[in-house]
Amino acid sequence: MHYSPKKDGARSHGLPYDPFKSSAVPRPIGWISTVSADGKHNLAPYSQYQNLTWDPPMVMFVANQSVLDNGKSRKDTVRNIEETGWFVWNMATYDLREAVNRSAKALPYGEDEFEFAGVTKASCLEAPGARVAESPINFEIEFVQSLHIPTGNPVSTFDLIIGRVAHVHIKDEFILDDGKIDILSIKPLARLGYYDYTYVDKMLSLIHI
């Protein structure tokens, strides 16, 4: 099959679900925690998250407009980041899958997703918000830039957030004797298309020729 999102629109594939989302897989989950200037905590997963560079370590994620008002306002996460200059990435894992899923629910402004998801707040070294204590790895990230990108569709306009990693927290029990992270024990969760997810339970190594 072939379809042209540029010519005929993103939904011109004629399938019941979007094949694009199921082709760009697996995607790391941006489980992002923030706090507002007046101290209201927020936690939400974003399925379009990725690292940009490793030296200095920088990351990015995309947030669509809020679904609570038909896409007319920006997400609480984005507003909090621009207000405080910080956000935290928390590694989503298989064991935390239910908490990740619960934190995806769009709650009214000011309701605490940490409490709703049933996870614990841990203090940060520099970021004003909290990190997920149960997560094996957390990044404290300093806000660098946001790009508000129009798409021509009023309900799919999005914000691209770029940040620089200032602090990395790793639970000691997940560092192997050879200094590598024990990924197979962590079982990182990743996003697929539809309502599907996967997690890392197999690895292979390829030496560059």
What are these regions (language model features)?
Residues M1-I207:
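Basic, polyanion-binding surface patches
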